[in-house]
Amino acid sequence: ILEYTIRHGFDINNKEALGDEPILTTTKDNRSISIEGSILFRIDKANAPELWENIGDNFVSKVVRPYSRSRISHVLSEVNSKDIPHSRSQIEETLKNELNQLFSDKGIIVEGVLLSDVKILENTIGTERIVFASPTK
């Protein structure tokens, strides 16, 4: 299983590194948020040759990163900010299902999506309010 980590401080300069910077999006109630977390996935052995033939070594920059950013942004744009803490497991399950639909024909299987930090970004520069955070912070 591979872990694609979305976190502050990730170096996006390596296009094929398994990770990304926090995803910035807007909730249904028009609040700007920053999202960190992990996507756990594996290469489907049965479809691995097709993955390498059609996409090659660049599957992170061509598939995992753009699809993950798009789906995370889309799913959280349909949720009100006040509902995020109570809907965390449902959001994670929705993301897992949607990513699996997109990845399955590419030979990638999503095992899980874990949201570790969701922060509401206030209008004041540099101000944020944590919606939920991983226990290690």
Kindly label every feature range from the protein language model.
Residues 1-9:
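Short extracytoplasmic
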Residues 8-137:
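Elongated, amphipathic alpha-helices that form coiled-coils and helical stalk/scaffold elements used
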